[in-house]
Amino acid sequence: MFDNFFSLDIPGEVISSLIVILIIMVLSIIIGIKAHFQDPLKRPRGLLLLAEEGVKFFDNFAGELAGHAMPNFGGFIMGVAVYLFIAFIFGLTGLPSPVTYMAVPLSLGLTTFLLIHFISARFTKWKYFKRYVEPFPFFLPVNLISMWAPLLSLTLRLFGNAIAGWVLLTIVEYALRDLSAMVFSFIPSDWNQIFLAPIPLAILHAYFDLFSGLIQTTVFISLSAIFIGQEVPEELSFNTLVNERR
């Protein structure tokens, strides 16, 4: 449907991803406007209340898993979580899900991967390079290979689960079409081919796009927070936590 968008050879999943980003941008603008005109003496309601609770939740979530030395890290985690969850449930519309396109999980995994090394270099300075020759210098090749483990883990885990659901849904859809054509072959029209499909496919879509999407989103942001939190010195995170509680 989207593959020839405006006569451009762009994969449908990429267009879906742009739509998801547009949805998030519109929601952000609406929340920003509501926050601007919100009376500080009154309790927020509706979308603004949801956004406020979301910010609190992801700030605490990031603090628990990644430490308290990065006060703004919860915003990154929240942004990734919102994008991923909407991207998963986007398949409920019948349009391509962005997560089933390898470039999308790879981009998310690469973002976390680069952030891991940026945080490590920021807090450890020149000692960052020492990690590649520990415990002995001849471990350099092994360490250079193992440094890619978080990128592969995050990308392949996310893409594998998304594409597995898509493959299963496709197989079930074709099987139900053939079964419907066989059972209702006496009905002279094409609609009999999808007669049995709506209810089973709706249930599977609800699982893979909604329930499984929530699980995969949670797993991805949890691993991202843990991987990044491992690069923050423990004493720095502890001192920040102590200062916050004073």
Regions found by a protein language model. Name each.
Residues M1-R246:
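Selective transmembrane helix interface/packing segments
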